Each structure stands twice: as C-alpha cells, then as structure tokens.
C-alpha cells in the first residue's frame, strides 16, 4: 500500500509538472500572467522540480526585479508584454524565432523542408494522441505536435497513472499504447518529448527577450534533460 501511495504521489507531481509547462508554452492568457506576476509561477516551478528530485535553477518569471506594479495592474502589464513576445517566438513573420512544433524540429534535423500537419513526425504524434483520446479541439486548426499540446498529453497520462479516471472518449488503461497509462507516458516521453524539447528549450532560452520565456525554457529543460 505504501509503495502504491508513493507511486501515485510521483505521478501526481509529474502531472503538475506538465500542467505548468503546458500553461507556460501556450498563447499567454490572464491565468498565466497572474501566476507569473504574483510569484506563484516561480513557487510552483521550484516545488515541482524539488518534488521530482530535479535540482535546477529557474530564473524569476517576471525578471529579477519582479513586476513594477503589484496585483491586477501588474498582471495586465505582463500579459501585454508576453503576447507580442509569444507571437515573435512561436508564430513569427515570416518565420518564428523558435518553432513550437515537433515536426518542424524533426524536419530540420533531417535537412528537409518542414510542412505543418503533413510531415511524418506530426502525423505520428497525431495518431498517438488520438489513440490516447486527445484530438484537436473542435473549431481549431492547431497541429497536435505543438509543445504545449504534447505537455498536456503527458499531464493527462500522468494523471491516469496516478489513478484518475479516463476522460470522456479516452480508452481504458489497457487500451492505451503499451497497455497502461505509465507505458504510454514513458513511450511518448522518450520517443517524442525528449527527442526534441531539450533543443527547443535551449533555443528558446537563447532567443527569448522576456525573462518569463527564459524561465520557461529553464523549467522545460529540467523536465526533459
């Protein structure tokens, strides 16, 4: 019984780790800005990495001096700063400074022209996610190999491994790749996340102009390093 409780607590910590990563790397919203401006992001990142035994130094999300204004005004100012930076980094005109798509990184590694959606790695990710019950939200056209979506998948699989019930439309544990949530998690972590996210985190740290994205890069790098 003790081992089961310990295992569940580790899986819960992993789920929290990937939840924070997903929040940090999708398009910035008020929830993220409030957490980063108020110090909650820094606190959560430190606690999660400590719980997982990952000794990493993550810089302050709002910079060394913090936000100039406390409370909602500080969060609003941070959100206004993060959104154009996220667009520059992850969308770009014409090219992003740091593509958030696994398929683009795989194509770059292979020396071929990356094509969103139709490249082999992106299609492989989409098949894996659908086999886990995670599909593209209705009305959206976002490729499923986006870094935040991959973090969300790992969060869901970790929650399942911790004992959470399957969400609507998701297979039972035996129906997941590898026959269990833990096996599916390890397969996706080693075969996908760890194959490209370390390099993504390194480039993000180098390209980021806002301290939050340098912090997010250090945090993600600790998770996949």
Predicted regions and their residues:
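Surface/interface-facing alpha-helical segments and adjacent flexible terminal/loop regions used
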Residues: 1-225
